[in-house]
Amino acid sequence: MIQRRDLTPLFEPRSVLLVGATADTLKWGGWVSKSFGDHQHLRDTHFVSLRGGELYGLPVRTSIADVAAPVDLAVIVVPAPGVPDAVTQSLALGAKALVIITSGFGETSAEGLAVQEALVDEVRAAGAVLLGPNCLGLYDDLGQLNVYGGTFPSGDLAFATQSGNLALEVALLLERSGQGLTRFASVGNQADLTLADMIRDFAHHEASRVVGAYVESPRDGADFADAVREAAAIKPVVVFAGGRTAAGAHAAASHTGNLAAESRVLRAILRDAGAVVVDTPGAFVDAVSTLRTGKTLGRRRIGIVADGGGHGVVSSDTVIEAGLEMATFSAATRDALQPFLKLNAPNNPVDLAGADASVLWHFHGLVDTMLRAEEVDAVVMTGYFGGYGAYHPESGPLEMEVAEAIARSSDETGKPVVVQSMEEASGNDTIRRLREVDVPVFSRIEQAIDALVLLDRPPIVQGVAPAGVPDRTLGDRPAYPEARAALAELGIEFPPGQLATSAEEAAAALDAVGAPAAMKAVAAELLHKTDAGGVVLGVSTPAVAAETFTTMKHRVEAAAGVALDGIWVERMAPSGGVDLVVGARRDPTFGPVVLIGVGGVFVEILDDAVIAPVPTEAAHLAALLRTLRAYPLLAGARGQEPVDCLRVAEIAVRLGDLIIAHPEISEVEINPLRATATGATALDARIVTLG
């Protein structure tokens, strides 16, 4: 675990120095100059510029050496050639934190990178920290420290980003949703301070209720994931991960490699570390608005209060489609709801149609009753609420009182309430008050339901040790027979099979293993047998086995340009169950990961898989399987028996143990793994070694 760095001089300096000060507010130095000048009463402020003169009533020194007092924070906004000297002189003044806005370093050339690395060495030798270069600064709301230039709404999100301009959009969306920032940092080149450093600092910042980050490529992926895991144990973490469609991934040797591309692994690792991972600025802000409440979803049973039949129907559909459950009210709950409904039935969703000022308190009665019912875990309000004061101004104060009462009920029970209001965009007094008292408000019902899904977060897995594996020396390029033997030693079941090196041996093998059989081409260089015509199913007699051997050998060797080691004859597994791919891969950034996907040979087409770092727990992987789109197949769709998901997860864990124990393995994969109600059988396997 990397130690948290002291960023007090960066975010809470007692004195600041701006190198590159100017009155021109069209320049970055001008923005920062004005901000420092406006807040000079909060800290000692020093300006340096070759022009000299005066700014905001303060003298502008022509040299850093002319600044007599020591400084905590130095901000450098001068052309790249002047940065090294500015850094040296700032450190001589005692600066313990530096921000280099200037670009033209590691992001541009090898020469620029060399200069950047020298700056980092100098800064670290002085016991200081460096933000940047090529960054857009930082912001601290409590101390009114603004090295960003733009303005931010106040709130309780601490946000670090690899894209400074994206922060503007996030800030605008936060403001529209009644939220804001406590701290912000643009990390630029991450030459010294990284996103991970910021996340660790934000996790311990008392004023910040949520930690957020925008990431494309963390400098040290494993450290970034560790920082997220540490922070998520303290407060909610939301990561906006960009680059999910990047096409730069190298060709992989297996389905596991193709599915476990860098962007997917990043997202999976972060989710496993406890973060909520989103793909758009809007989703990021929705997540922050929800998670800042500090509430969680105990189970998945939702009660709905609607003031119109259509809203109730649509919200119910959305709840089910999101994988949540509609709560079934007990008789006692139905009796308690009835007085608020007049002639309407106390069913879920509850329909409070035709409400007016005289019955606004009924909203609270319904919500409070549901929240106090054992069979309800959260409540969704959908329709007009939040807008009655807009339609009937005299109802505004009463609606505000009802909103506050609903929030109190939510706090008293510890159960979340989310609101979908047609008046959300107006930001009226009721909408604003709901947000102030930790009731999230959204304009669309799918946003509200997605918010509840975010609150259903699995526990963070920590401290799992890998299990040992049998000692075995693998060849440089193990073919199927060797891979199968290695996996069988881990307790993974395979059908009976034999290797045939001639047509006669193929016929004898069929007699030995039993019909019907599958025949599969064997060669270390043959990565995808099916594509080369190297798999034939349903071989039923020795004569057919002999003929298949001859034709397959010629076909595959001609199509793939490889010499076969032989053809494997294997008894076919009974039909039924679900075909999966289960694999482990050594990711170059995050280390070993495992993958479970649906579809067998079609797994990449279906694109439905879960990924997790290893070592991990089988129970955790089994729970992750619930997030697959095709999970209903595993759970027993259309009268089928449910699959033994725990056994599937145990096999994935063992593959993870194998790749940890054998650093020479880059990938190991079972595809397909036929999973049934009573276990799982491997029908094909591959081990790929490094080199």
Q: Model segments located where?
A:
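Catalytic-core regions of core metabolic enzymes
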Residues: M1-G691
